[in-house]
């Protein structure tokens, strides 16, 4: 393996939508979003570890994160489950990256914020997005591939967006 991309995630589906207010939160949606967005990627990283410990070439494990998971970048509030799940993903994979650095030295992690991508995930929320800030899946994939091939080798994990801005 030289590149592994974990690109699962959920923001909404039938009966589940981002919470605008604290009063809209409840345990089942919080658990569902956390499980899908944070725990599933961690379990993939766990399952891959035995294979990557014996891998003889550098490998980048990428997970799709989101800037809304940043504590410092949260200026608007809302979206409790999604924000918390992406913050948890960032911390879980940072912790895993440190462990990998000790046991699978050729593995690096990239937490990638793709920006708002024209996809079913963002479709209900695109009305407030400028066309210049709504990216095609092809553009996002090309930016991701470029970043995966150009990481700083001395860092076990990097948080980058499509412009290579540190997140």
Model regions and ranges:
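C-terminal helical subdomain
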Residues: 111, 119, 123-167
